Amino acid sequence: MINNKNVIEMGLRRINQVIFSIFLLIGGCVAPPDYSDGLLENVPAIVDETDYFSLSLLGDDYSEDKEWELSLMTDSTDTILTTLVLADLSISNTDSSILFMMNDSGDTVFQPILLGNVVWSSDIAVNLIGSPKKISFKGDNFTGRLEYQILKK
């Protein structure tokens, strides 16, 4: 009778341990943050195709230099649509983030200094600036949203 009682107590302890472990595992789980726009903070999102390039950045004191070689295929008869949207910027006097677009000759053909909220777009003939080949972002405490696109028309 004593052995049966010990076996039952050991079984109940084992069941309690399993139940406690399950509650601990379920209760300890943390869901990932809910990003409504899909952007992760300080992680540039890039889409690079033969007819389209997009750079999206949600920066919070972002201070890195990044370069992207473009897959964009253009010839001298093409026109490109370039758009830049800057929003929710928080800039101090010492911040100096810059975006560059370089052509196939290595010349800088677009260089906005990112100082304030802006919505800008322009059609540019490739024969005037050369074929875009590289995008460079020099981040210096960039805080805000940057959306930059190049679309071959």
Say what each PLM segment does.
Residues 1-12:
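N-terminal secretory signal peptides that target proteins for export/translocation
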Residues 80, 141-153:
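C-terminal interaction-tip segments
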Residues 82, 126-140:
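Noncatalytic modules at the cell exterior or secretory-pathway interfaces
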